[in-house]
Amino acid sequence: MSRRCELTAKAPMVGHKVSHSNIKTKRRFLPNLVNVTFLSEALASPVRLRVSTHALKSVDHRGGFDAFLLKAKNAELSPKAIEIKRRIEKKQAANAG
């Protein structure tokens, strides 16, 4: 299981831990990832993803899980999220047409 957000592609960063005497040692800054179950309105089913807490705020800001996925770029999404996005688009096209 990688330490990468499935919605925003937020990943670990590398930097320095700096002591009081200014000695620098390498360290990793890990994203705050949580396992979340989103409810897709279009699919009417729960979707379980591993996302960052920043992504949770972004999903709320954009108006829900379906709206977030439809506005998101495929380059930022995981393969699982891209497949869910395609299913949502297909379902909405079937309902509209």
Swiss-Prot record:
GO terms for biological process: translation. Transmembrane segments: none annotated. GO terms for molecular function: structural constituent of ribosome. GO terms for cellular component: cytosolic large ribosomal subunit. Gene3D superfamilies: Ribosomal protein L28/L24. It comes from the Bacteria. PANTHER family: 39S RIBOSOMAL PROTEIN L28, MITOCHONDRIAL, LARGE RIBOSOMAL SUBUNIT PROTEIN BL28M. This is Large ribosomal subunit protein bL28. It comes from Nitrobacter hamburgensis (strain DSM 10229 / NCIMB 13809 / X14).
